[in-house]
Every structure is written in C-alpha cells, then in structure tokens.
Design a protein with these regions (language model features):
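Hydrophobic alpha-helical segments, chiefly the membrane-spanning helices
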Residues: 4, 12, 22-348
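Polybasic, lysine-rich low-complexity intrinsically disordered segments
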Residues: 2-3, 7, 17
Length: 348
C-alpha cells in the first residue's frame, strides 16, 4: 500500500510540477508578448514623429540654402531614408550572402514607387513639376534598365554566369556621379516661393538628424517586435520574411513620403522616392560591389527586374499628361503592387 501511495504521490507531484512549468511558460510568454506590443507602439510613434521632424527640417534646410525642395528630397531625404538598404547590403556582402543584395534593392525600388507613392497620393494629390517628369523620372528608368543589363549577362552569351562584377559596380558609380553633377546644376536655382525658413540652418540640420535617428530607431523597433509577435503566433518564417522584413527597410521612405504628402511638401515626397531608387542602384549596389566584390545574381527572376522597370515607366506615364498624382493614380499603383506581391507570395 505504501508503495502504491508513493507512486500516486509521485505522479501527482510530477503533474503539478508540469502544470506549474506550463503556466509559468505561458506567463513569461504573455509578458514577452505585452512588451513586444508596447515596443511596437513605441516604434510606430518614433517613426511617425521622427518623419514629421525630418520633413520639417529638410524643408527648412532647402529654404535656408536657397535650393529647391526637390533637390533636398533627391539628396538629404532620399539618401537618409535609404540607409537601411545600404546597411543590409554591406552586411550581406561581408557575410557572403551577396544574392540578398540584389533582391533587397529591386524589391525596395518596386515597393517605393507602387506602394509608397500609391499610399502617399491617397493622402494628398501631389503636383509633379515639369523638370521631374522630363528629367528625374526618366533617370529612374535609365538606372533601372542599366541594372537589368548589368545583371543578366547571359542575355548576350548563354555560357556566362549572371554576376554583377566589380567593373559593373564602377559603371553604376559613374552613372551616379553624373546624377550628382545634374543635381549640383539644378541646385543653383533659388526656391520659387521665396519663403522665409522657419528655423536657422543649424537648427534645421539638427531636426534632420534627430528625425532620421527617430525613423531608423522606430523602424528597427517595429521590425524586431513585429517579427517577435508573428513568431509567438506561429507565423511561418517565410511569411515573416516576405512581409515584415521586406517592408521593414522601406519603412523610412514610407513614413517620410506620407508625412511630406500630408504637409503638401510634394517635392520632398516624390524626390525622396526617385532619389532613393537611384541611390539604391548607384550606391547600395555600385559602391559595395566596386569595393568588396561581385554580387551573384543566381536564379533571380526576370519578372522582378521588368516589374522594377515597368513601375518607373508607369510613374512617367501617370504623371506625363496631368503633371500630378491623385487618388486615381494611387489606386492604380496599389492594385498593380497587390498583383505583383501576390505573385511573389505564391512563389512565382
């Protein structure tokens, strides 16, 4: 009898211990989930407020320097918001995952035009200036075509492996230098409105820096904690990479362009996207490739490249006649993006 009682006691003790362990696990998991949700909210607050300060600082900087806001959008804003793509590319190349670099840039460029400009135009109708339609948007098309030609060497010779070589990287850098020269030439034009800058140049640049730090920190918090929440809810790694991670590097461009559109800073909103796309190809691809080494194209799909070119051409066609992007054009871009992304998720 004593042995039987002892066995029953041991079984009950084991069950109680297992139950306690399970409840403790759920409790800790619940706390982690709450912390992740709170940090996710903090991330979004930092993103939105950071973008707000960033746009104000960029606009004031343009007025202080007596240059057009488009130039500031194409340079300070675009290069600042493209920092995540650049960081991802450098890390990928140094770790030997060079095939990630191309996907990062192409995916970001497609998302920038179709999704970000699409969403931004829903918030406010964006007037596009003649110079942007005739010069800056065609430059985006040119850089997209250039990357496609340099990526697919076997178009011309079936025996060649698709690789973006160091020479290709130097070529894209040279094209980017020409782009910078073009920006320098148009930067001489004074701002058309003759507005007074709301802040002095020092404070304006400080706002740009503070805003950018807020955007980058907010982006990291959103991506990290959204991923943690998704994993806790048993969302697959593939779905996380196709959604949260893929959109993560473009969050700075998204919040900056949306905030700029809401403030009717159209040149900053559009310049940010055009400048980011050119920067992604000229610097994010060109510089690491020229300095570190080749980028393997691997089995990268032609459809993705042609979608990138098509998105740039679509932007030109939508703005050529009316010289603006409104809700109608925005919905067209969003619809095309949904179709393309559906293809990507299904596995194309």
């Amino acid at each position: 009898m004593k042995k039987e009682h002892r066995k029953v006691y041991e079984v009950r003790w084991y069950r109680d211990l297992s139950s306690l362990h399970h409840r403790l696990f759920l409790y800790i998991g619940g706390i982690k989930m709450i912390i992740s949700i709170l940090l996710l909210i903090v991330g979004f607050v930092l993103l939105i407020k950071g973008a707000d300060i960033f746009v104000d600082g960029a606009s004031s900087t343009a007025l202080n320097l007596k240059v057009s806001k488009m130039v500031i959008g194409l340079t300070i804003v675009a290069f600042g918001t493209s920092a995540p793509e650049f960081a991802v590319s450098i890390k990928a190349l140094l770790s030997g995952s060079s095939d990630i670099v191309l996907g990062n840039v192409v995916g970001s460029n497609i998302l920038n035009i179709l999704l970000i400009l699409g969403i931004s135009s829903l918030f406010s109708s964006m007037v596009v200036k003649d110079n942007t339609v005739k010069k800056e948007i065609p430059l985006t098309i040119l850089f997209s075509v250039l990357l496609t030609i340099l990526s697919f060497d076997n178009i011309f010779d079936k025996n060649i492996t698709n690789v973006i070589t160091r020479t290709d990287g130097i070529v894209t850098l040279l094209f980017f230098i020409v782009f910078i020269y073009y920006l320098a030439s148009i930067a001489k034009n004074n701002n058309e409105e003759n507005e007074e800058a709301p802040y002095k140049i020092g404070k304006s640049l400080l706002f740009v820096l503070i805003g950018l730090v807020g955007i980058v920190a907010g982006s990291n918090l959103v991506v990290d904690n959204a991923s943690a929440i998704a994993k806790a809810l048993n969302v697959s790694e593939k779905m996380i990479s196709l959604t949260i991670v893929a959109f993560g590097t473009s969050l700075p461009e998204l919040v900056t362009s949306v905030q700029a559109a809401r403030k009717h800073e159209n040149d900053i909103a559009i310049g940010n996207i055009i400048g980011s796309n050119i920067f992604n190809i000229g610097i994010v691809i060109g510089l690491p490739c020229a300095l570190i080494g080749n980028i393997n194209v691997g089995t990268f799909n032609y459809i993705d490249m042609f979608t990138m070119i098509g998105a740039a051409i679509l932007l030109f066609l939508l703005t050529f006649k009316k010289r603006k992007l409104d809700k109608g054009e925005g919905l067209i871009m969003l619809l095309i993006f949904i179709v393309y992304y559906g293809y990507v998720i299904i596995g194309g």
